[in-house]
């Protein structure tokens, strides 16, 4: 009996160790693409330009919250959303998605967490209350945020979000979130 329990315990612990190591290696892989492949997009002159323009619009938190309420209530695509999805910034993001096989969406946020531009309509306009913006904007310091891998019913596969700062002159002025197909990351 004791021998059976010991064998079971060793098997369970060994499996947990292997799974833990594999998960750690995957997280390292995601962190590596965040830093080496995705973070440089946060320095792109067009992304910086559009983010600075949005930051200089003078939008208050009340303005952002009103837009967020309106945005969330909208079932489809409204005319007021089109500049975020059809402008030059969004077109640039779509080009990036088309060139990187593991990406399925990108959206850029300003220094308050409001949408600057995006490839697909987000569920809300205000992202500033979410970890992806908070950790990547990091009070203007900039950081990398790799979210947990989750199964997406719509895609039928595992996905995750990776967020990096939009940087200008050594300071975070916004953030970018990338939707990533977990199984396509090499």
Task: Give residue ranges: language-model regions.
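Bacterial N-terminal signal peptides
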Residues: 9-18
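Bacterial N-terminal signal peptides that target proteins for export
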Residues: 1-9
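Juxtamembrane extracytoplasmic/periplasmic/luminal helical "stalk" adjacent to the first N-terminal
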Residues: 23-78, 102, 184
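Short hydrophobic alpha-helical segments used for membrane anchoring or interfacial signaling
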Residues: 105-111
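Conserved beta-strands of PAS-like sensory domains
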Residues: 157-186
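Short, small/polar residue-rich loop motifs at catalytic or cofactor-binding pockets
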Residues: 100-103, 158-160
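Extracytoplasmic/periplasmic sensor domains and loops in membrane signaling proteins
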Residues: 78-93, 120-150
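Amphipathic coiled-coil signal-relay and dimerization helices
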Residues: 70, 114-119
């Amino acid at each position: 009996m004791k021998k059976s329990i010991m064998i079971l315990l060793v098997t369970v612990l060994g499996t947990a160790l292997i799974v833990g190591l594999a998960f750690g290696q995957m997280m390292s892989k995601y962190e590596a693409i965040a830093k080496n492949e995705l973070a440089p997009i946060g320095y792109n002159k067009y992304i910086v330009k559009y983010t600075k323009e949005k930051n200089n619009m003078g939008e208050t938190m009340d303005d952002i919250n009103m837009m967020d309420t309106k945005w969330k209530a909208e079932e489809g695509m409204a005319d007021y959303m089109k500049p975020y999805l059809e402008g030059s910034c969004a077109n640039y993001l779509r080009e990036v998605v088309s060139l990187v096989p593991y990406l399925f969406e990108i959206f850029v946020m300003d220094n308050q967490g409001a949408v600057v531009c995006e490839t697909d309509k987000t569920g809300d306009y205000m992202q500033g209350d979410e970890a992806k913006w908070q950790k990547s904007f990091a009070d203007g310091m900039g950081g990398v945020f790799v979210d947990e891998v989750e199964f997406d019913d719509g895609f039928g596969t595992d996905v995750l979000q990776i967020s990096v700062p939009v940087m200008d002159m050594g300071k975070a002025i916004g953030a970018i979130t990338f939707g990533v197909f977990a199984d396509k990351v090499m």
